[in-house]
Design a protein with these regions (language model features):
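Adenosyl-5′-phosphate
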Residues: 3, 8, 25-35, 45-47, ...
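Phosphate/oxyanion-binding loops and surfaces in catalytic or ligand/nucleic-acid-binding neighborhoods
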Residues: 18, 36, 108, 140, ...
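Short secondary-structure boundary/capping segments
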Residues: 162-164, 205-212, 464-465
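Short, polar/flexible loop-turn hinges at active-site or ligand-entry regions and domain interfaces
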Residues: 1-6, 24, 60-61, 167-170, ...
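Cysteine-centered catalytic environments shared across enzyme families
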Residues: 1-165, 177, 181, 375-376, ...
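Active-site proximal helix-loop segment of RNase H-like, two-metal nucleases, encompassing DDE(D)
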Residues: 165-168, 410
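Active-site adenylate/phosphate-handling loop in enzymes that bind or generate adenylated species
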Residues: 179-238, 319, 324, 328-348
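Short, solvent-exposed loop/turn segments at secondary-structure junctions
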Residues: 96-97, 120-122, 152-155, 197-200, ...
Length: 481
């Protein structure tokens, strides 16, 4: 049996990214199997792994009427994922990807269709709610829509969510995913989702930023230094997110090779701030460079792809695999629900991924190819809507409904007992967030999730804490036609 010695290079990556990439785990003697790999145990040779699938490397010519081809490929993938012995439901956030999947589903089948969406209430609800778009899409295609009400009193959910995930995981979408999976799983055993559309069709702001960064990196170093000096003078607006900090890192002179630049976009809590977070006794044992080494290795393994392909490849191998897919699958299975991901189907990926960068994205327009393919199929409002992301309003929750909980979990006495973190630094992060001087939701959520996980997996006997069949939180659901 493996010892429960913590792997602090892996955990440092967790505090940097919000998740732990495979093959690492929180424990030094435990490893995960990477996606697209098989593992074979032989009595004499021991354990060996082999990669059996990867994203295609070669470019393919862009066919004429590529938008029509993409629409057909999407329909084929959704139809393949509808094959089931039991009724199928769908997650519908109102965003472009889930709307595209539901539209294809409606075109493929005349059977009754039922989708579920999140409706937020309380602190920060307006910033997260996409119910109006979900309602419009459901009405356009005759889909029964159940709105799952999400209130900010989620304190009792965090422990069962953490235990379902098995390891520290700081993605703020965990709470709405849990409540939606709970609601869907009460009536269905299979559900479609729109996961994977951002990674396949270049839907994140970081993809545009990455391409801009490639042009910026070609400027003379003296120009870069001047722009960086001006950016350093920018003050972060009260209550601002990470945007100003990321801009400063983006404009840093000679801001690294392609994998390091992309890692900068994914980083939630950078060095040296992260290094200062740790207790003095721990700092010398944390290199702070584990994620960079891992990203560079992935990049070289795939032949150092250029342009947008580098960003999309790293997104697939890191964020999609170890954050989004891992979280959604584990939470859904905690409710005996199988989620299906037609936008991650290997046949669709093998057709779309090798297409030209210029087809997929414009200088200021993400998902250009997908939006053109869906023109006439989705309402114009869906095609123009800004991206929000499927996350709850955790910044507001931490300032209000969850404030007492995080104050308890990160109390100086508990931190001193754990011995991992500097209580003064943590207190400063809390004060920054509560006073709205800075938005510290990302690192505070990561610390909160780690504390809950540590109590269940390190401080208690090694037996896995049970995941309740149902949490005490009962979401309010209402159906609309």
């Amino acid at each position: 049996m493996a010892h429960r010695e913590l792997d602090w290079d892996a955990l440092d990556t967790y505090f940097q990214l919000g998740y732990i990439p495979a093959p690492a785990t929180p424990f030094r003697e435990v490893r995960k199997l990477e996606p697209g790999h098989t593992a074979v145990w032989n009595r004499t040779r021991g354990l060996s792994t082999r990669q059996y699938w990867d994203l295609p490397r070669a470019r393919t010519p862009t066919p004429r009427d590529v938008e029509a081809h993409v629409a057909d490929w999407l329909d084929e993938s959704v139809q393949a994922h509808l094959v089931s012995d039991v009724p199928v439901a769908a997650f519908l956030s109102g965003g472009l990807d889930s709307s595209a999947v539901v539209a294809s589903w409606a075109l493929a089948s005349d059977a009754p269709r039922h989708a579920f969406t999140a409706k937020y209430f309380g602190s920060g609800a307006a910033s997260a709610d996409e119910t109006d778009l979900a309602r419009r899409l459901a009405a356009a295609y005759g889909v029964t829509l159940t709105e799952v009400d999400i209130h900010p009193d989620v304190r009792d959910l965090l422990e069962p969510i953490t235990y379902a995930l098995d390891e520290p995981h700081a993605d703020e979408s965990a709470v709405p995913t849990w409540l939606l999976s709970q609601a869907v799983g009460a009536s269905y055993k299979v559900a479609l989702t729109g996961i994977g559309g951002d990674e396949l069709f270049a839907g994140y702001r970081r993809h545009i930023g990455f391409l801009m960064g490639e042009h910026y990196a070609r400027l003379p170093r003296t120009v870069q230094r001047g722009v960086s000096a001006l950016a350093h003078l920018l003050r972060e607006p009260q209550g601002a997110s990470l945007s100003v900090d990321r801009l400063k890192r983006f404009l840093r002179p000679g801001n690294g090779c392609a994998p390091d630049r992309f890692l900068g976009y994914l980083t939630r809590f950078p060095n040296p701030d992260r290094h200062a977070l740790y207790a003095p006794a721990l700092r010398d044992h944390v290199s702070g460079a584990a994620a960079s080494g891992w990203f560079r290795d992935l990049y070289q393994r795939h032949g150092a792809p250029a342009g947008l392909s580098a960003a999309l490849y790293l997104d697939y191998k890191t964020f999609l695999a170890d954050d989004v897919l891992a979280l959604s699958d584990r939470i859904a299975m905690a409710h005996a629900l199988e989620i299906r991901v037609p936008l991650v189907d290997h046949e669709l990926v093998e057709r779309v991924f090798p297409l030209s960068d210029r087809v997929k994205i414009g200088l200021w327009r993400s998902k250009r190819l997908l939006k053109r393919a869906l023109k006439g199929r989705l309402p114009e409002q869906h095609l123009r809507a800004p991206k929000r992301g499927f996350v709850g309003p955790t910044a507001a929750w931490l300032r209000h409904e969850l404030r007492g909980m995080i104050e308890d979990e990160l109390a100086p006495a508990r931190l001193q007992r754990l011995g991992y973190f500097d209580p003064t630094v943590v207190r400063g992060l809390l004060d920054d967030h509560f006073s709205r001087r800075h938005n510290r939701a990302g690192i505070l959520w990561a610390l909160l999730c780690f504390s809950i996980w540590h109590r269940g997996y390190v401080e208690t006997p090694p037996a896995r804490p049970p995941v309740p069949e149902d949490s005490e939180y009962v979401p309010h659901a209402k159906a609309a036609r």
